[in-house]
């Protein structure tokens, strides 16, 4: 059985940063994730997608953010159970927990932090009868490596941020980019909508609104998409393509976590955000996109903040008789479990009394 101080379910950015905040408090951590590598969606779905709202990083690729977090937490030597899904939660008489995965791996900890992002997730697929026949043969629901689309004819379907952002990005990569949306209005960020409109005027993106992709054609690989216009006079058109990317978001599923007795609201875990992001089960916390409370913002930086607050509460729960005195890392440095220590260089600027 694996024993630790804080058992973190979910190894996305929020889960990884929890390791750092716990490490500053000398708390050991272990992470469980169903994916085969750390990083969550940032690694699995869009490692090459730029992120613009991480403090001090005007722009950083999602995969690079994960790499930086892994380097930041390395001194605290976290444990990982990867490729396994947290299946059951058992509360013991002493208030601690045993979490067992779908492969039977058992973990014991006094504190459990659910940082599973959206939980398990599946792409929302358009109702095209033969779409499964072309998956990985021209149809993709995620963009992991934009270079795959270099000099290709690409059709993107969707009207949200992902569809807009990837249309903008692939305009510099693909030979042709068409963005198909069933409405005339888009639901994404205003600057993204404006940028797509600018690129459309320059002929670098073709915007096809009030239309839907309703069919796919090809022998072994995708060769054409069938686009149906709401304007019956235009009817249907057959467009030659190399790749079709429907981006209709993810369908979040809490999976087995949903049966742990947690208070759930709209497929998210309710927490007490006035104090420490604890759930209705004492000792079980939920941080990051998986939780919900009034005013919740599903941002990576929000997850980082929640992780810091949660770890302070976890420390008091594990050591109720100890009082932790907050020390800034600029003063106390960062002392890892591997014996390393990072600290500011101390220099004498002026001797006292001289």
Curated annotation (Swiss-Prot):
Q: What is its EC number?
A: 1.18.1.2
Which Pfam families is this protein grouped with? Pyr_redox_2
**Reaction it catalyzes:** 2 reduced [2Fe-2S]-[ferredoxin] + NADP(+) + H(+) = 2 oxidized [2Fe-2S]-[ferredoxin] + NADPH
Annotated coiled-coil positions are none
Q: How does it assemble?
A: Homodimer.
What is this protein identified as? Answer: Ferredoxin--NADP reductase 2
- Record key words, sorted: FAD, Flavoprotein, NADP, Oxidoreductase
The record, for Gene3D superfamilies, names: FAD/NAD(P)-binding domain
Cofactor comment: Binds 1 FAD per subunit.
- Mind listing the GO molecular function terms for this protein? ferredoxin-NADP+ reductase activity; flavin adenine dinucleotide binding; NADP binding
| Residues annotated to bind FAD | 14, 33, 41, 46, 86, 121, 289, 330
Keyword check for NADP: yes
Position of the signal peptide? none
**What are the names of the required cofactors?**
FAD
The UniProt entry's sequence similarity note says: Belongs to the ferredoxin--NADP reductase type 2 family.
